[in-house]
Amino acid sequence: MNIAVDAMGGDHAPGEIVRGALMAAAHFPDIEITLIGDEEKIRPHVTGEERISIIHTDEVIEADDEPVRAVRRKKNSSMVRMAEEVKEGRAAACISAGNTGALMAAGLFVVGRAASIDRPALAPTLPTLDGRGFVFLDVGANVDAKPEHLQQYALMGHVYAKNVRGVEKPRIGLLNVGTEDQKGNETTKRAFALLKETNLHFIGNVEARDLLQGVADVVVADGFAGNVALKTIEGTALALFSLLKQTLTSGVAAKLAAAVLKPKLAGLKKMMDYSEYGGAALFGLNAPVIKAHGSSDANAIFHAIRQAREMVVHDVIGTIRAELERA
């Protein structure tokens, strides 16, 4: 199994990207990894791993590039060439920590949208207080969604949670402004009715305040609401850890307490670090495409590659297609 990796995407490229790829190649003997990007910058970081190859490119899609224009004009960019490896069947999946919009465009225009999918969805796995985590989709691939799209998101999330995350009977929740059945706008009300008709384990509406409590294994939303909720969770977590740091360094007694609590705080931070779950999968394409966080370090890239491998091993794309045809 070959996995293509955009070595030039992200804040710490190419060093941390290559390190993560080396970790994954050493850990999973059944994969080969193709690093795509500027070979002169990549080569110094590659240290003797036989199952790592490099494809040289001389263009990079930058964070501030307009996504669709960049994908169409920068044909020799690391991201576009990465997607072409998948399209041509030389790679089974691909990963990038680069420009999110450009990756979605490359996924749609190069890898291609699956025939049975109306709208792709961007789906990270976020941590919960019980350590189980939950799949959240859509968080920004499409700001608008029809009820039928939300139903498809639920099915895709179900397949992923069951086959990759090992949840036997995933609980599906619909993000809404209240838990009562009739809450929400016309889109969510209609989506609620559609989800009730499926064979999925639909538990009803869920509120944003309960997401980190582990109320559901899969939460579906339109891309606008999903992205707002995701950014709120990220911002709140950063603010809380910043506040804790200020409090625990504010005096001698606080610093002594911090020394005692340091192992516990490190464990808490690790538990809430969603890079441990991999990247955000772009569901609805012809092959697994993973968006790693822009600030990904080697460990995050390792987990994104692990995630891509598991999606291929468990044939998540084929299973989604079969489930949609059966629905």
UniProtKB/Swiss-Prot annotation:
Q: What InterPro entries does the database record attribute to this sequence?
A: FA_synthesis, Phospholipid_synth_PlsX-like
Q: Is DNA-binding found in the keyword set?
A: no
Provide the protein's localization: Cytoplasm
Which biological process terms from the Gene Ontology are attached to this UniProt entry?
fatty acid biosynthetic process; phospholipid biosynthetic process
Arranged from A to Z, the UniProt key words for this protein are: Cytoplasm, Lipid biosynthesis, Lipid metabolism, Phospholipid biosynthesis, Phospholipid metabolism, Transferase
* Source domain of life: Bacteria
Q: Spell out the molecular function terms from Gene Ontology.
A: phosphate:acyl-[acyl carrier protein] acyltransferase activity
Among the entry's GO cellular component annotations, what is one? cytoplasm
Pathway linked to the protein = Lipid metabolism; phospholipid metabolism
Catalytic reaction list: a fatty acyl-[ACP] + phosphate = an acyl phosphate + holo-[ACP]
- Coiled coil: which residue ranges? none
Q: What is its EC number?
A: 2.3.1.274
What the entry lists under Pfam families is as follows: FA_synthesis (PF02504)
What enzyme class is recorded for this protein?
A: transferase
How this chain assembles, per its entry, is: Homodimer. Probably interacts with PlsY.
What is this protein's function? Catalyzes the reversible formation of acyl-phosphate (acyl-PO(4)) from acyl-[acyl-carrier-protein] (acyl-ACP). This enzyme utilizes acyl-ACP as fatty acyl donor, but not acyl-CoA.
Protein family membership: Belongs to the PlsX family.
Q: Which NCBIfam families match?
A: plsX
**Stated name of the protein:** Phosphate acyltransferase
